[in-house]
Amino acid sequence: MSNIVGIEYNRVTNTTSTDFPGFSKDAENEWNVEKFKKDFEVNISSLDAREANFDLINIDTSIANAFRRIMISEVPSVAAEYVYFFNNTSVIQDEVLAHRIGLVPLKVDPDMLTWVDSNLPDDEKFTDENTIVLSLNVKCTRNPDAPKGSTDPKELYNNAHVYARDLKFEPQGRQSTTFADCPVVPADPDILLAKLRPGQEISLKAHCILGIGGDHAKFSPVSTASYRLLPQINILQPIKGESARRFQKCFPPGVIGIDEGSDEAYVKDARKDTVSREVLRYEEFADKVKLGRVRNHFIFNVESAGAMTPEEIFFKSVRILKNKAEYLKNCPITQ
């Protein structure tokens, strides 16, 4: 059976995978690790410190979706979990400010911390091995050198705006050595936390620990982790002249090209197509084009929140899935 998911005017066809043992008497479809190694491909389209776009080819939907879910909710990261206020005379309530601080992504390698043991008493639970302490001490005052007639709070006052960069790392115990080369800082220092006016101040300490996105979104290491199937566009009959230009406008820029010599439309880059099915609205193209998606070709887009690079996040998701498989394989209940 074809591995192309059909995209028609009012429906999607061939959506079910059939490549499993027993479906057809003419094909074994038995999974083979050597065949998988030979066929599986990873193509990287773009990669930087915050975003990655790559393809996983010849892999099952269940595995691709497992990677996506693990990146979102099971790869650990560090975030503020406990916030202790000493003074807060701003207009923002303690709990709201604590929530904002918790959502600030921190640039820290989660492998440098251990998990907090919830079974221990509170006085033994937090150590320099599992907890990072950040402090925030800001007071707003009038600026005596402010330009006359200015109405800009940034000119009139000192510390009128409190940003994530105002959170200061306070090493505990051996952390001054452990984090000597990579002090903990917010991944995005310009996140606005609060606005102050003269006389108002904020003084607090935030204790940051390991967590996963499945417990709270603040621990998710990604802003987004998504995939889509590779679009496929088959031109069944030649489309030329003005008809070719109308055909081209039915797709996003860069998807369809027009040959300068023959004035005929051709598929330039199907990857850029959003599969809007706009072309299927026109009867003149109804029998001239066939749309689809390749079932086993996944285009991933991963945006890091800043704590780790996208490739680190993906590799960690692979490791977690591998550990899950090992656990299932060796679990006593499966023996």
Curated annotation (Swiss-Prot):
InterPro entries: DNA-dir_RNA_pol_30-40kDasu_CS, DNA-dir_RNA_pol_insert, DNA-dir_RNA_pol_RpoA/D/Rpb3, RBP11-like, RNAP_Rpo3/Rpb3/RPAC1, RNAPI/III_AC40, RNApol_insert_sf, Rpo3/RPB3_RNA_Pol_subunit
Residues modified to Phosphoserine: 17
SMART domains named among the record's database cross-references: RPOLD
Modified-residue entries (N-acetylserine), positions: 2
SUPFAM superfamilies: Insert subdomain of RNA polymerase alpha subunit, RBP11-like subunits of RNA polymerase
Assigned keywords, A-Z: Acetylation, DNA-directed RNA polymerase, Nucleus, Phosphoprotein, Ribosome biogenesis, Transcription
GO MF, any single term: protein dimerization activity
GO cellular component, one term: RNA polymerase III complex
Entry superkingdom: Eukaryota
Locations listed in the record: Nucleus, Nucleolus
Any one GO BP annotation for this protein: termination of RNA polymerase III transcription
Claim: Cell inner membrane is one of the keywords in the record: no
Keyword match Phosphoprotein: yes
Subunit structure: Component of the RNA polymerase I (Pol I) complex consisting of 14 subunits: RPA135, RPA190, RPC40, RPA14, RPB5, RPO26, RPA43, RPB8, RPA12, RPB10, RPC19, RPC10, RPA49 and RPA34. The complex is composed of a horseshoe-shaped core containing ten subunits (RPA135, RPA190, RPB5, RPO26, RPB8, RPB10, RPC10, RPA12, RPC19 and RPC40) where RPA135 and RPA190 form the DNA-binding cleft. Outside of the core, RPA14 and RPA43 form the stalk that mediates interactions with transcription initiation factors and newly synthesized RNA.
Task of the protein: DNA-dependent RNA polymerases catalyze the transcription of DNA into RNA using the four ribonucleoside triphosphates as substrates. Common component of RNA polymerases I (Pol I) and III (Pol III) which synthesize ribosomal RNA precursors and small RNAs, such as 5S rRNA and tRNAs, respectively. RPC40 is part of the polymerase core and may function as a clamp element that moves to open and close the cleft.
PANTHER family attached to this UniProt entry: DNA-DIRECTED RNA POLYMERASE, DNA-DIRECTED RNA POLYMERASES I AND III SUBUNIT RPAC1
Record's miscellaneous remark: Present with 13000 molecules/cell in log phase SD medium.
Protein family per UniProt: Belongs to the archaeal Rpo3/eukaryotic RPB3 RNA polymerase subunit family.
Protein name: DNA-directed RNA polymerases I and III subunit RPAC1
Biological source species: Saccharomyces cerevisiae (strain ATCC 204508 / S288c)
